A protein has these predicted regions:
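Short coil/turn motifs at secondary-structure junctions
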Residues: 153, 208-212, 231
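Short, glycine/small-hydrophobic-rich surface segments
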Residues: 62-63, 69, 85-122
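Short, conserved structural patches
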Residues: 192, 197-225
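A short, surface-exposed beta-strand/turn
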Residues: 137-141, 217-231
């Protein structure tokens, strides 16, 4: 008789019968932690670089704004000084009769009374209204403030008692660094003594702002040539 064998339903140890459904396959925990550290480190580095660039850009903008403000205020003062210095000695005695000059010496403006590296005194009818003023631009020793003093001249040639003081500009560094604010040249053919023979005044204004948010002070140098128009 032929007898057929039957397999039992047992699973023998050591034999693979396939994966068990529903159980996830986890990656190596050590590799994942290393990758996370590298990503965080890279992110931190990029963030630091980005912040540094933003800060540098901000400082650059602040420096440009400070420089622009310094330039604008300096240019305004320089334009006024240039206009008035060009009119030094206006009107001269040539504009009047000799008898008028003798009777009213205050009609005539003396071109330059004092001319030094940091102090210029002159007379002019700057408003062209016939009223002569004695004007002084002075940068005092150790000071960064440039002042303008103005005193009206009486018809008899004397000066009025009241003087108007105006702060033209601060942060002027010429005294601090030893650079002359004013230089000049004279007319060699003029027989008058100095400073009456001064023909032109040159302004060299060095400005520097105080520290700002940029961390660096703004610096500007402005120059002008002021020839006397009625020389």
């Amino acid at each position: 008789m032929l007898v057929r064998g039957h397999h039992s339903g047992k699973i023998f140890p050591g034999r693979r019968t396939g994966s068990i459904p529903g159980r996830p396959i986890l990656p190596d925990a050590g590799v994942s932690l290393l990758e996370l550290i590298l990503v965080l480190s890279l992110f931190g580095t990029l963030t630091a670089i980005a912040l540094a660039l933003v800060l540098q850009s901000y400082k650059g903008v602040q420096l440009r704004l400070s420089t622009s403000t310094l330039f604008d205020s300096g240019t305004m003062a320089l334009n006024q000084m240039t206009k008035e210095l060009r009119m030094a000695g206006y009107p001269s005695a040539k504009a009047f009769t000799s008898s008028a000059v003798t009777s009213y010496p205050g009609l005539v403006a003396t071109p330059f009374i004092t001319v030094t590296a940091y102090d210029v005194v002159f007379q002019s009818a700057t408003h062209q209204d016939g009223i002569v003023e004695q004007i002084e631009y002075v940068l005092a020793p150790g000071s960064q403030n440039l002042y303008r003093y103005s005193t009206h001249k009486n018809l008899n040639g004397s000066l009025q008692a009241s003087t108007v003081q105006t702060l033209l500009l601060n942060n002027v560094q010429n005294r601090i660094i030893g650079t002359p604010l004013f230089t000049w040249n004279t007319n060699p053919s003029d027989t008058q003594s100095f400073p009456l023979n001064v023909q032109s005044v040159y302004i060299n204004m060095v400005l520097q702002s105080t520290s700002n948010e940029s961390g660096s002070p703004a610096s500007v140098t402005l120059t002008a040539t002021c020839p006397r128009i009625n020389f």
